[in-house]
């Protein structure tokens, strides 16, 4: 050891040992202070990590869940991406804290408790050995010359043992001190450097994470700015509408006052000068609101409360009022309160589109209908002391109503009188009033029915479709029986195969797997039966589908000599047959295609060319036939390159193909000249073409048979890219709901969301949220 030039036990040696011990003691003090600082640093890191996690949790609670309408309105799906990033950053802090603990704190503690402590204990052992050696030496040198030899020998042996122990403890002390001297040269540098490396990794991970989010952050900031500007425009528009509404209300009030004065001058003749439209025309035209507003309605109970109700009179002579729970009942009409709970919710329009609201704007308003066909109207109430009242008297009930002023009362009376006259002078009485409810029946109507009757009819028709799926589908040719065993009134269907099934055969279809047959119930799976699916079934049906899947059976029926029997050795099962018989038949029919007459392509026209033409001509049945009868399982993903020269638009040499060169769509000459993404079809699939055609039934058929949602064309564009570029937001939302990935970048390096925002502000909130959720 270079520090100890001479290892003899000398004053110089002892001085060096003392010097090293002093250094070790000072180092121990410093290490203890550093240990406390590291503990505090670790506590700070831990608190920072917990704080960031708590912040992320608060953001998550603020953003709400995926079905929360407030979450959707404030951009919850977008915030969720930032929440994930914050949690990642918190995990990085936690990892840094663990690195500090493992690399610095534990090693520092080990140095204090092991190395420095060993030096201290070595000093104690050395002092004890030195004292024992001194005593043995003193005893030995104090012997007289006449001391017996055995005593001398015993003390001499004891002296040698003491000296040996002393030397051993002396060198142990030296080793302990030199271990400290050696470690202090690298131990702390290594630990601190490792900590700095951990910091480097921490910041690098954070940078990489935020760098990946940077484009998305800027997109959201851009969108927020655009939304802010759009909101300002909408607020200005609302202010103008409010001003126009107030002006019009004042004009209407003045007109009502003038009409009331005119009616008073004519002896309060009700409906005296009201011009009648053509009765038949007004009743067959689209329903529109003639008058709507609040009236006080007197209850028929003993308490005779007055409640404020919203009444609507439409052009079909229907008068109804809404039963809101927000209005407070009044003990007397003199205690009228103008406050009513008719809040529609700031985000009502957005919520309605997502069908996620429990507010009064979402169709939860019950309403009662007054049958005007057998009613007459009288001014004033039974109690002549009450002002501004009128009565609607029918055989079932008398409605006592009170307006806010005389002009409003006369306007209501005149228009109701006109409606009664219109009903009495029409053939409408002969029609079954299925759309009206009696006074005791209630229904649910959308809030915007107050403004327009079109939405009421639309919702009613949608409800009827939902209730009559079985009737609609069974009404198609051959659909009154199971496609497999002819059992009557099938209650199940295969969405992609387009056939109706009995419950037993549907079980076999489920066992085939969803890649072969997607089985759904006609009555239970109500959300499945969208108009597009119903239209697809209208194009197919049991008769047409079985003409393909059971082609050889039908061929046998047409052959009188039985020459085709060798082609079809299977017979169609009956409803009474066992499950195993039906299973064997269905497996052979769909898995082996044992009864399908194979498609024989024309010499000059391949199956790929024919299905391409069928898609372009929207021939649903021909597409279905080619999918069934063609042996190529990939025909559903036929590309433009499969039917034409691959160099029709762009020449691809071997070198480009080898390096997979990217081809930015913005530099494509054909797209630039036409400004249409469909101009360059190279690499496009049937799904790309269907998105441009805009036929939802055609799109549904391709998706049902497993068309690749994320297939890319020559320019790296998916069908979703094409929908966004052409402004077909409806199809874009369909593809996103079915699993299309908007994160895929085209050969220009831009994702679907980036392409959409490149075209300007995304005004369709639902589309933006779908893009943000799936990105």
From Swiss-Prot:
Expressing tissues: Expressed in roots, hypocotyls, cotyledons, leaf and shoot apical meristems and siliques.
Transmembrane in keyword set: no
A GO MF label: GTPase activator activity
Domain PH: from-to ranges: 288-421
GO terms for cellular component: cytoplasm
Keywords: ANK repeat, Coiled coil, GTPase activation, Metal-binding, Repeat, Zinc, Zinc-finger
Function: Probable GTPase-activating protein.
Protein name as it appears in the record: ADP-ribosylation factor GTPase-activating protein AGD4
Organism: Arabidopsis thaliana (Mouse-ear cress)
Lineage per the UniProt record: Eukaryota, Viridiplantae, Streptophyta, Embryophyta, Tracheophyta
């Amino acid at each position: 050891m270079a520090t100890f030039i001479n290892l003899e036990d000398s004053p110089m040696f002892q001085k060096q040992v003392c010097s090293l011990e002093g250094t070790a003691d000072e180092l121990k003090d410093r290490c203890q202070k550093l240990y406390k600082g590291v503990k505090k640093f670790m506590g700070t890191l831990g608190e920072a990590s917990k704080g960031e996690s708590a912040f992320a949790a608060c953001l998550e609670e603020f953003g709400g869940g995926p079905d929360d309408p407030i979450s959707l309105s404030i951009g919850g799906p977008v915030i969720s991406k930032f929440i994930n990033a914050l949690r990642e950053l918190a995990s990085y802090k936690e990892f840094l804290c663990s690195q500090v603990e493992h690399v610095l704190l534990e090693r520092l503690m080990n140095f204090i408790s092991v190395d420095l402590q060993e030096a201290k204990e070595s000093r104690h052992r050395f002092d004890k050995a030195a004292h024992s050696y001194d005593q043995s030496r003193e005893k030995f040198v104090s012997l007289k010359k006449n001391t017996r030899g055995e005593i001398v020998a015993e003390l001499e042996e004891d002296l040698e043992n003491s000296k040996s122990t002393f030397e051993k403890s002396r060198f142990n002390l030296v080793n302990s001190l030199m271990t400290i001297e050696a470690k202090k040269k690298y131990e702390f540098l290594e630990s601190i450097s490792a900590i700095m490396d951990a910091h480097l990794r921490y910041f690098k991970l954070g940078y990489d994470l935020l760098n990946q989010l940077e484009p998305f952050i800027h997109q959201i900031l851009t969108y927020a700015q655009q939304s802010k500007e759009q909101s300002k425009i909408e607020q200005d528009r609302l202010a103008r509408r409010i001003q126009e509404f107030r002006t019009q209300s004042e004009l209407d009030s003045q007109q009502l006052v003038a009409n009331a004065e005119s009616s008073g001058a004519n002896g309060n003749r009700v409906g005296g000068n009201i011009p009648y439209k053509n009765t038949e025309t007004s009743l067959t035209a689209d329903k529109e609101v003639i008058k709507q507003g609040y009236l006080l309605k007197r209850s028929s109970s003993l308490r005779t409360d007055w409640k404020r109700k919203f009444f609507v009179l439409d052009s079909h002579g229907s008068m109804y009022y809404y039963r809101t729970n927000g209005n407070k009942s009044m003990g007397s009409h003199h205690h009228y309160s103008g406050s009513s709970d008719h809040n529609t919710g700031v985000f009502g329009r957005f919520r309605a589109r997502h069908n996620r609201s429990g507010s009064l704007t979402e169709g939860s308003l019950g309403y009662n209908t007054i049958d005007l066909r057998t009613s007459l109207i009288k001014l004033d109430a039974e109690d002549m002391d009450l002002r501004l009242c009128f009565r609607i008297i029918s055989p079932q009930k008398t409605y006592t109503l009170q307006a806010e002023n005389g002009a409003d009362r006369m306007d209501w009376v005149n228009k109701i009188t006109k409606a009664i006259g219109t009903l009495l002078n029409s053939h409408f009485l002969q029609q079954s009033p299925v759309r009206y409810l009696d006074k005791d029946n209630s229904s649910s109507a959308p809030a915007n029915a107050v403004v327009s009757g079109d939405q009421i009819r639309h919702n009613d028709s949608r409800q009827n479709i939902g209730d009559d799926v079985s009737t609609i589908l069974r009404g198609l040719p051959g659909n009154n029986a199971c496609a497999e065993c002819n059992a009557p009134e099938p209650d199940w269907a295969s969405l992609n195969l387009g056939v109706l099934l009995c419950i037993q055969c549907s079980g076999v279809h489920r066992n085939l797997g969803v890649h072969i047959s997607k089985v759904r119930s006609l009555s239970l799976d109500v959300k499945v039966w969208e108009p597009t699916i119903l239209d697809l079934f209208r194009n197919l049906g049991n008769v047409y589908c079985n003409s393909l899947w059971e082609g050889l059976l039908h061929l046998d029926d047409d052959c009188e000599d039985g020459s085709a029997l060798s082609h079809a050795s299977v017979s169609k099962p009956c409803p009474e047959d066992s499950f195993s018989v039906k299973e064997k038949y269905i497996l052979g029919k769909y898995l082996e295609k044992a009864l399908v007459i194979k498609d024989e392509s024309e010499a000059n026209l391949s199956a790929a060319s024919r299905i391409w033409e069928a898609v372009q001509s929207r021939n649903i049945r021909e597409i279905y036939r080619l999918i069934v009868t063609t042996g190529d399982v990939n025909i559903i993903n036929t590309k433009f390159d499969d039917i034409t020269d691959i160099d029709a638009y762009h020449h691809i040499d071997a070198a480009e193909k080898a390096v997979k060169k990217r081809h930015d769509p913005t530099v494509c000459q054909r797209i630039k000249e036409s400004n249409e993404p469909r101009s360059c079809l190279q690499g496009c699939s049937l799904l790309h073409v269907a998105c441009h055609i805009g036929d939802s039934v055609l799109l549904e058929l391709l998706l049902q048979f497993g068309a690749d949602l994320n297939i890319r064309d020559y320019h790296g564009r998916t069908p979703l890219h094409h929908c966004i570029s052409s402004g077909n937001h409806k199809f874009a939302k369909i593809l996103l709901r079915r699993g299309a990935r908007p994160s895929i970048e085209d050969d220009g390096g831009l994702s679907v969301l980036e392409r959409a925002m490149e075209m300007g502000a995304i005004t369709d909130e639902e589309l933006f949220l779908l893009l943000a959720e799936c990105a």
